[in-house]
C-alpha cells in the first residue's frame, strides 16, 4: 500500500515553481509528472525521473498546474513497486501585461425572420469565473433607440423580437449586484463604457457587404490579358479607433504557383475602412511575382502604439499610394532602396522579370563561370558540366561564350527533357532571379517606417537550393518559398517572423519593431543541403550544412503555426515537422523509422493543425499530413507539440496499439481537425478516414479538408464546402455531418483553386463565433457572414486569445490554414479550463 508523499513549495517565479519532498525509505527513484487541468479524466504527463528530492517545474505561473510525485521502490515480479505518492497544485503568481489591441464592443445588428439579432464582444479581462454554460463576469444592458430593453447575463447575443431595420442599438457593460440592480462599470479601455449606436445591416440578411475598388487589369509581355480577383485578407486596427480595418490582397488572374512558368500581373494590397473607403494601396511592383508563395503580409501592432502596422517582402518598384477621404490621391511614393543598391546601379524603375531569352543568357553566363562557383572550387561539385550531365568532356574550361551556349543548348534540349518531359526550359519566363529583395514595415496609414534587406537573399536561381537536382527541373522554385508569422517570443510583445525555404534549405528570421526600426532577435538557417551534383541528386532527404540547425532542412510546410508548446509563457514557431524555441534554438526536428528500419525525417506536408486536440492530455497536439510518400515514416500523424514525437493509440483497456501515424505510399494531400462528432470526446482528425483523438477509427464519412470554421451555437466545428475539393464550384458552404448545411451563400466564391479558402475566417465582430469573409462573384465586394442563431454560451472573443490572434495574422500565409485557441474549444469543453489570465 502506497504512503502519502508531502510536497513542499520552496519558491515561485514568473516561469518556474520550485519544490521538494521528504525522503521516502526504500525509494529507488521518483517520477515527476503534471497535468494542466483538475479534471479527473486528464492524464498526467511525465516530466522527469530522478533520484533527487527536489524539482523545478519550468512552466509559466500565470495558470495552475497539478504536480504529482511518485516514489518507486525495488522491482517485484519484474515491475517497479509504487510506494508513495503526493500531489500539489501550483499557485497563480504571474499576471503578465500582454500587449493587445484595444477594440471596441464590436456590436452588430442583423435582421432575421424573428426580429433583430444582436451580438457583441466579451473580453478576457471582463471574465471573473465559470458557469455551467460558459464564463461569468461583466453583464450587458441592451438599448434600442437609446432606451433600455434588456439586461443580458448569460451570453453576448440577444434577439429583439420587436426591433425593425430602422432602429439603432447599443450595449453597455454592467455589473449586476446581489440586489439585481445593474450598475455601469468603469475603466479606461475603449469598451468599458456604453458603445456608440449601430444600425441594422443594410443587406437585410446575415452578411455585411463592403464594396471595394477593384484595380484595373493589364497585359503581360507575352500579350496575355489579366484581371484582378479578391484573394487573401487580414484585419487590424490600423488607425486606433477600435474598429478593424480590412487588408485585401488582389491577385491577378494569371497569378502562378512557384512551380509554374509564365508572366504574372502585379500583386496589390489594399486597406479599407469598414464603410468601404480605400485608405491606401500597395502595388508590389514588377519584381514581386504574384502567387500564393510570394507575398505573405503580416498585419499587427508590432510597436505597441495602438495602431496595426503591416510587414511585407518588397522590391525595387514597390509603390505606396495613400488616399484622402474623398478618394483622391494624397501621395504616391516608391519604397526606400538601400544606398548600397542605388550605388550599384539598381533603381525603382528596374524590371528583373526574365524572358525566355533572358533565362537562356543567364544560363550561358552561369556555365561560363562554372569553375568560379564556390561549390566547384571547394570540390563538392564536378569540375565540368559534362560530368554533371554524365557525358564525355568536350570543352576546355573556363568555357568560352560559344562553348557555354552549346552546353546550354544540350542542357535545355537533351539533358533536361531526358529527365522529364515537363522540363520545357526554352519556355521558362516570368520569374525573378536577380535584383534586390527587401523587407518593409508600413504604418497603419500606409507610411513607410523602415525598409531593410530581406534577411535571407536568394543567392542564385535555385541551383544551390536543389531546383535543378531532381528529375523535374524547376528553377526559382524551392528558393522562392516564403512564410511569415507573428509570435510573442518574450510572452509580452509581438515579434515578426519571416522565412524562406522548406523543401531543402530552411531559414527563419525574428524581429521586434521598436522606435521605427527592425531589431533582430535571432536568425535560423539550416544551411544548404550538400549535393554531389546539383543537376542530379536528391537533396530532400538530407540535412543542411549548419551544425545546429541542419536537421531543420526539408521539414517545413506550406504554412507554419505559432503556439506556446511547452507552457513556459513564450510562443514557439512550429515549422512543419520541426519547432524553433522562443529564443531561437532548435527545440526539435521530428524523425522516425520507415518500414525498412531506416531513420527518416517526417518531412514536408501541405497541411498542419496545432491545437488542444485531446482535452485529457496536457499541452497541445499537432496533426499533420506528410507528402514524402514512400520516403516518409508517416502519411499523417498526431504528435505531441512539446516534443514532436508521434503519440500512441490505446484501447480502453490501455493496450498500446502503436503510433497514431500511418505509413502511406502516396501524398495524401490535406488533413483537418474539429469537433464534428458530439458522441466522441476530443477533437476528431481526418484525412480519408475519421479518427478520435485516441486514434480509434470512427464510422463517419470524412468531411471537407478545405477549411474549418467555428460557426455553430453549440461550440461544434463546421467546414467549408464538401469533401470533393477537386470538382465543383467553391462558394463557402458551411456544413457538418450533424447539422447539415448551415450556410449556403449565393453569388460568392472561395479562393486558391482546389484549396477552396475563404478570404478570411475570423471572429471580426460579434460574439465568440467565427465570421466568414468571402469575395463576391464579380470581385467588386466582400461579404462578411455571421451566424444569427442564438447561443446561451458566454465566452470571450477568441481575438483576445493570443494564440488565436496571431493565427489570424498568419492565416494568409501560403496555403491558408485554420487557426485555433490555446484552450480546448468544442461542444464538450470544460469551461473551467479556459484561461482567464494572459
Where are the regions a protein language model picked out?
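Recognizes extended acidic, P/S/T-rich segments that occur
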Residues: 29-62, 74, 119-166, 177
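Non-cytosolic beta-sheet module surface loops
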Residues: 22-25, 59-61, 111-112, 122-124, ...
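Mature, Sec-exported extracytoplasmic domains of Gram-positive
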Residues: 1-4, 24, 34, 38, ...
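Extracellular recognition modules
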Residues: 66-72, 170-174
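Beta-propeller-forming repeat regions
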Residues: 100-102, 127, 141, 151-155, ...
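Intrinsically disordered, low-complexity terminal and linker regions enriched in polar/acidic
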Residues: 3-5, 9-20, 29, 34, ...
Amino acid at each position: 500500500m502506497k504512503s502519502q508523499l508531502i510536497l513542499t513549495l520552496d519558491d515561485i517565479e514568473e516561469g518556474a515553481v520550485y519544490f521538494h519532498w521528504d525522503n521516502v525509505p526504500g525509494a529507488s527513484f521518483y517520477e515527476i509528472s503534471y497535468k494542466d487541468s483538475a479534471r479527473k479524466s486528464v492524464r498526467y504527463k511525465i516530466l522527469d525521473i530522478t533520484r533527487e528530492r527536489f524539482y523545478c517545474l519550468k512552466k509559466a505561473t500565470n495558470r495552475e498546474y497539478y504536480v504529482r510525485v511518485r516514489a518507486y521502490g525495488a522491482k517485484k515480479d519484474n515491475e517497479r513497486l509504487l510506494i508513495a505518492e503526493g500531489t500539489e497544485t501550483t499557485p497563480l503568481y504571474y499576471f503578465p501585461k500582454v500587449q493587445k489591441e484595444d477594440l471596441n464592443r464590436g456590436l452588430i445588428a442583423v435582421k432575421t425572420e424573428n426580429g433583430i439579432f444582436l451580438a457583441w464582444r466579451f473580453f478576457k479581462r471582463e471574465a471573473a469565473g465559470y458557469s455551467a454554460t460558459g464564463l461569468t463576469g461583466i453583464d450587458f444592458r441592451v438599448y434600442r433607440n437609446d432606451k433600455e430593453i434588456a439586461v443580458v447575463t448569460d451570453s453576448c447575443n440577444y434577439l429583439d423580437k420587436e426591433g425593425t431595420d430602422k432602429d439603432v442599438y447599443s450595449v453597455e457593460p454592467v455589473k449586476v449586484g446581489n440586489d439585481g440592480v445593474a450598475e455601469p462599470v468603469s475603466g479606461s479601455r475603449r469598451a468599458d463604457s456604453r458603445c456608440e449606436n449601430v444600425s441594422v445591416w443594410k443587406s437585410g440578411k446575415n452578411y455585411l457587404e463592403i464594396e471595394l475598388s477593384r484595380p484595373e487589369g493589364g497585359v503581360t509581355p507575352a500579350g496575355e490579358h489579366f484581371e484582378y480577383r479578391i484573394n487573401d485578407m487580414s484585419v487590424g486596427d490600423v488607425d486606433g479607433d477600435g474598429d478593424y480595418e480590412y487588408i485585401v490582397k488582389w491577385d491577378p488572374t494569371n497569378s502562378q504557383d512557384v512551380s509554374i512558368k509564365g508572366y504574372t500581373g502585379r500583386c496589390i494590397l489594399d486597406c479599407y475602412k469598414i464603410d468601404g473607403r480605400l485608405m491606401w494601396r500597395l502595388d508590389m511592383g514588377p519584381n514581386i511575382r504574384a502567387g500564393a508563395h510570394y507575398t505573405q503580409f503580416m498585419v499587427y501592432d508590432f510597436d505597441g502604439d495602438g495602431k496595426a502596422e503591416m510587414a511585407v517582402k518588397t522590391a525595387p518598384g514597390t509603390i505606396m499610394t495613400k488616399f484622402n477621404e474623398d478618394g483622391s490621391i494624397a501621395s504616391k511614393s516608391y519604397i526606400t532602396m538601400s544606398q548600397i543598391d542605388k550605388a550599384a546601379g539598381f533603381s525603382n524603375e528596374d524590371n528583373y522579370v526574365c524572358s525566355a531569352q533572358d533565362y537562356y543568357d543567364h544560363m550561358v553566363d552561369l556555365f561560363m563561370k562554372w569553375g568560379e562557383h564556390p561549390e566547384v572550387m571547394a570540390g563538392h561539385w564536378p569540375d565540368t558540366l559534362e560530368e554533371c550531365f554524365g557525358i564525355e568532356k568536350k570543352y576546355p574550361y573556363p568555357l568560352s561564350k560559344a562553348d557555354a551556349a552549346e552546353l546550354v543548348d544540350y542542357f535545355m534540349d537533351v539533358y533536361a527533357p531526358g529527365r522529364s518531359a515537363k522540363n520545357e526550359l526554352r519556355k521558362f519566363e516570368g520569374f525573378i532571379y536577380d535584383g534586390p529583395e527587401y523587407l518593409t514595415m508600413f504604418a497603419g496609414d500606409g507610411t513607410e517606417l523602415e525598409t531593410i534587406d530581406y534577411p535571407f537573399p536568394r543567392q542564385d536561381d535555385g541551383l544551390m537550393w536543389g531546383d535543378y537536382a531532381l528529375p523535374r527541373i524547376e528553377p526559382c522554385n524551392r528558393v522562392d518559398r516564403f512564410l511569415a508569422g507573428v509570435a510573442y517570443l518574450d510572452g509580452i510583445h509581438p515579434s515578426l517572423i519571416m522565412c524562406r525555404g522548406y523543401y531543402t534549405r530552411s531559414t527563419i528570421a525574428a524581429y521586434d519593431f521598436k522606435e521605427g526600426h527592425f531589431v533582430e532577435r535571432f536568425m535560423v538557417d539550416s544551411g544548404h543541403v550538400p549535393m554531389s551534383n546539383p543537376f542530379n541528386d536528391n537533396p530532400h532527404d538530407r540535412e543542411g550544412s549548419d551544425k545546429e540547425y541542419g536537421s531543420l532542412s526539408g521539414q517545413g510546410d506550406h504554412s507554419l503555426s505559432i503556439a506556446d508548446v511547452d507552457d513556459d509563457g513564450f510562443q514557439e514557431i512550429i515549422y512543419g515537422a520541426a519547432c524553433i524555441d522562443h529564443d531561437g534554438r532548435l527545440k526539435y526536428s521530428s524523425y522516425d523509422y520507415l518500414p525498412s528500419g531506416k531513420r527518416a525525417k517526417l518531412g514536408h506536408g501541405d497541411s498542419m493543425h496545432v491545437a488542444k486536440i485531446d482535452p485529457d492530455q496536457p499541452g497541445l497536439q499537432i496533426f499533420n499530413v506528410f507528402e514524402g510518400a514512400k520516403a516518409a515514416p508517416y502519411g499523417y500523424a498526431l504528435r505531441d507539440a512539446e516534443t514532436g514525437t508521434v503519440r500512441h493509440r490505446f484501447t480502453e483497456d490501455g493496450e498500446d496499439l502503436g503510433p497514431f501515424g500511418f505509413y502511406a505510399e502516396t501524398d495524401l494531400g490535406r488533413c483537418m481537425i474539429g469537433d464534428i462528432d458530439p458522441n466522441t470526446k476530443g477533437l476528431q482528425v481526418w484525412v480519408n478516414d475519421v479518427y478520435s483523438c485516441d486514434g480509434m477509427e470512427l464510422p463517419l464519412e470524412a468531411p471537407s479538408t478545405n477549411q474549418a470554421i467555428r460557426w455553430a451555437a453549440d461550440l461544434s466545428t463546421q467546414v467549408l464546402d464538401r469533401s470533393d475539393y477537386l470538382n465543383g464550384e467553391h462558394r463557402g458552404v458551411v456544413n457538418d455531418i450533424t447539422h447539415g448545411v448551415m450556410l449556403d451563400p449565393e453569388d460568392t466564391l472561395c479562393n486558391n483553386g482546389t484549396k477552396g479558402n475563404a478570404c478570411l475566417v475570423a471572429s471580426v465582430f460579434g460574439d465568440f463565433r467565427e465570421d466568414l469573409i468571402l469575395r463576391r462573384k464579380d470581385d467588386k465586394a466582400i461579404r462578411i457572414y455571421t451566424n444569427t442563431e442564438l447561443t446561451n454560451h458566454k465566452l470571450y472573443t477568441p481575438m483576445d486569445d493570443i494564440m488565436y490572434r496571431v493565427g489570424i495574422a498568419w492565416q494568409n500565409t501560403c496555403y491558408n490554414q485554420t487557426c485555433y485557441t490555446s484552450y480546448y474549444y468544442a461542444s464538450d469543453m470544460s469551461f473551467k479550463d479556459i484561461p482567464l489570465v494572459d
